[in-house]
Amino acid sequence: MLAKRIIPCLDVRDGQVVKGVQFRNHEIIGDIVPLAKRYAEEGADELVFYDITASSDGRVVDKSWVARVAEVIDIPFCVAGGIKSAEDAARILEFGADKVSINSPALANPQLITDLADKFGVQCIVVGIDSYYDKETGKYQVYQFTGDEERTKATQWETRDWVQEVQKRGAGEIVLNMMNQDGVRNGYDIEQLNMVREVCNVPLIASGGAGAMEHFAEAYQKANVDGALAASVFHKQVINIGELKQYLKQQGIEVRL
């Protein structure tokens, strides 16, 4: 059995790490490189960096910090934000990232997933999915441009269908960002994770809602996710990654110590 992964998520805007609640009202957390280093030293299995303004601004991630991160950490990391072509992805991977993640650009051009998977291998290609539960319709909808409050919009895709579509096109891993839960810290949406897990045959990473150690255990035990991503609880030092791993081990969950 593969060890379950703990993945801190760093939202980057204008070269600094920021954090919002439900994708809004971002506050500055600090500089990228020291935070990345701290998480690697605490025992994170992997890091994810989202340039949250890149796609909505129509620009690619400013890559200078990617090389600086690669110099100070020895764990895999993934970079997302405005990657619209194989050239964009190649540049990020050359700077030292291990994976690239695409979200809004994949919705605009699903062929991009296939192009990247063919060129770099599926193991490098992560698709991020921003999923919102609409209480009125009772459906989970995929949203686009979530890094910009003014441009965020629902797409025609229901979450379950898009999960199946991106796998057909070559996604090697899926990060499910549950927008209703984001930054609220009251637990992952287990029901939604189970719905997605049923149709997801690639590694599935839960994102949005972690507030306590039990929430991580729940996602692994009740929804069989491969990894859990969190931001607020790590940035604000509510949870220490080393202690979290000891706790998970006590719960009988396989983790790398």
UniProtKB/Swiss-Prot annotation:
GO terms for biological process: L-histidine biosynthetic process. The active site is at D11, D130. Pathway: Amino-acid biosynthesis; L-histidine biosynthesis; L-histidine from 5-phospho-alpha-D-ribose 1-diphosphate: step 5/9. It comes from the Bacteria. Signal peptide: none annotated. One of its GO terms (cellular component) is cytoplasm. Coiled coil: none annotated. Its EC number is 4.3.2.10. GO terms for molecular function: imidazoleglycerol-phosphate synthase activity; lyase activity. Pfam families: His_biosynth (PF00977). Belongs to the HisA/HisF family. Heterodimer of HisH and HisF. NCBIfam families: hisF. This is Imidazole glycerol phosphate synthase subunit hisF1. The gene is hisF1.
